[in-house]
A protein has these predicted regions:
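Electropositive phosphate-/nucleotide-binding environments in soluble metabolic enzymes
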Residues: 10-14, 18, 43-47, 121
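Extreme N-terminal segment that seeds HTH/winged-HTH DNA-binding domains in transcriptional regulators
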Residues: 1-37
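Short, basic, alpha-helical segments at the C-terminal edge of helix-turn-helix-like DNA-binding modules
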Residues: 63-69
């Protein structure tokens, strides 16, 4: 189960956690040294925060990276099961619904799902039902 960040987003550690997740989302996987260099942060602080992100379910240890010489660093990346995203494209007479894991990999894409768009509570409930069904199927 993924835990939430601190309510106080100005907290230095929360800011660093957000930046680590942004780096992984935008640029892929990193070693502790890479994170520390990108964030201009000490290696011990980075190690502690990456450990917390792993414990909270946001990141995972992807193993050792091959290296020509020296000690091989551990690589860390987003945990694809940390959460997912749902995109809904509404047309007048159908909907397209896509789900993606936390790493951005497509889990499902349901095209031309029967749905009539109306400005009513019932239409909204039906749309929520379609989305819920898509989530349950994944």
């Amino acid at each position: 189960m993924v835990k939430y960040f601190s309510e106080n987003l100005s907290d230095k550690n929360s800011i660093i956690k957000q930046k680590i997740l942004e780096l992984c989302m935008n640029s892929g996987d990193f070693s502790i040294a890479d994170f520390a260099r990108e964030l201009n942060c000490s290696v011990p602080t980075t190690t502690k925060i990456v450990g917390e992100l792993i414990d909270d379910g946001w990141l995972e240890d992807l193993g050792k990276k091959g290296s020509a010489s020296g000690r091989r660093p551990s690589i860390f990346g987003l945990n694809p099961e940390a959460g997912f995203f749902v995109g809904v494209d509404l047309e007048r007479n159908h909907a397209n619904i896509m789900t993606m894991d936390f790493k951005g990999q497509t889990l499902s894409y349901d095209e031309d799902v029967e749905f009539t768009l109306r400005n009513t509570e019932d239409s909204c409930r039906k749309l929520c039902g379609l989305i819920r069904k898509t989530l349950e199927d994944n």
